[in-house]
Amino acid sequence: MKQILRKAIALILAVTAVLFPLAQTATLIRTTDSAKLASQIETADANSVVIKAAIEKHYDGDGWNFEPRTSDGVHITPQGDGMHLKGHPDEAFFVFEKTAALEFTAEFDAGWTYNSKYSYFFGNDSEAAEVKKLADGSVKFTYKVKKGEKIAVTELTAACVNATADALPRLDISIDCDFESVTKDEWVNAKISLQLGTKVFASGNYNGSGKVKGRGNSSWGYDKKPYSIKLDEKTSLLDIPKTKKYAIVASYTDSTLMRNYITYKAYQDLIGIDYVPKCEFVDVYLNGKYNGIYILVERISIEKNKINIAEADEDNITGGYLIEKNVHGRVNYKKDQVFDCPYQANQVKDHFVLEEPEIEDTELRREVLQYLNVYMQRLHNSVMGFSSEQYTEYIDEDSWVDFVIVQEISKNIDGNLKTSCWMYKERDNNKLYMTALWDFDLAYGIVNWSNADEERNDASDCPGSGTYEDFMIINSSCPWIKKLYQQDEFRELLTERYTCYRTTVIAELQALIPEQAAYLAKAEDANYKLWKKNFCLGVANLQTWLNGRLEWLDEVWLIEN
């Protein structure tokens, strides 16, 4: 019965999220009605880990220290009775012990304006909550509490004040020919400049030169095309660590423009995966013509600030190697350094591609690829139980656990060890490490298909990515993930890690959606006029889907204390 009630409440919350995008976990709320309180406990119980973490952070033994989340460009100043609410926790609720008014003022830096649509302040209780815009552009927030009343802990932590930027950074790329003639195969000389927008970056503006070419697999076929950039000199753009290698990702299939962005930003602090690409939003102009909002992101490579390993050489071919898992249709057999995949998740042959180092010597390349063939077969045998060697001798559990969690949260159809999956092997170390999360523009419920067809051997076991329920990569035809998940040690580490992340990086993932929606709210108007993508509906759908997905994963992975 409890699970049925939870699902019913989840459905109500999902509908609410479409109508009121910021009411993500707020359950209701300010009441002394015992029947209403009882109905909320079912939802609160499912969030007990989140609630416990919130109490530990905000309750000081005497009351609640109220701390609304604020975006860039926002500054909070307490007013009146301040930001401390006298009271005590009571299971999933907080009981006020004093009648008082919670008051603060939000001020905004130049170029930033308050976004009421993507901010949230006790939205389910309009009688007690007041948001008032003042003549000087600041906004005053007031919430009146009464002694003896209760409020859901999740409502106290849901408050956020988010602002919209007047302008995004502007990235100009100019070449001597039309961009229609640019291909994925040949670099074209380019003049490249970057002018900062409203958001402050210490790296400042940029004027320089480099090269550009097309990039992507299916994304290259869309009208809004992605590009790779190679600067002439290592440079920090938008505070991304110095590198020559950048890309601009079009996010054409993603009406929110942010699926890749929130993934890369939220997961910078993973425990097991030691590198996630850095990125920022930009307005892109190609030969002076506006082409929409893109994500400027550093390209994956072996570098000090990225994947910091020593490259293999002729004296030591055990590593290090940067490897991408890819499929038959996306491999260039003439140019790529290809070696075999021991399993067959597709009807045609699966492959690994050695991305770095690029080996010029033909004989050394042959020797290295043969070494990697043998290595991957030994790894496969250990994972599948075909040899006496343990999988822990070849699999770095910490990074693989993180990889599974991230891909399952997003139900990423490109993240099931078939394509766009990156890993590395260090020299004199047998373990394979997952790294560099990449390519989430078809994740988080954006499509209803799953890559489950006869060509990919998934027709019977891989669920649709549009649903909240079921596993994606664990149930896919890649046998490694499924086999690892069957190991008690791996599965226990995964559930412990998920429980830890539920109040840290996953909470950050959720909070980034309204925050970045507010940030892009003005800039996306021009993007909409060009590409006709419904941003607001996309944001609401993304929030609803992610909340539903986490509800299901909580039931199977969350460890209740």
Residue ranges and their predicted role:
Residues 2-11:
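N-terminal Sec-pathway targeting helices
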Residues 98-99, 108, 114-117, 156-262:
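Conserved NTP-binding catalytic cores of kinases and kinase-like/nucleotidyltransferase enzymes
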Residues 216-218, 222, 348-417, 421-425, ...:
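Middle-to-C-terminal accessory/interaction subdomains
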Residues 226-230, 246-250, 257, 265, ...:
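Structural recognition of the beta-strand scaffold that forms the well-ordered cores
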Residues 235-236, 250-252, 272-277, 290-405:
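Internal "kinase-insert"/substrate-recognition segments embedded within catalytic cores
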Residues 269-283, 412:
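Short, well-structured beta-strand/strand-turn elements
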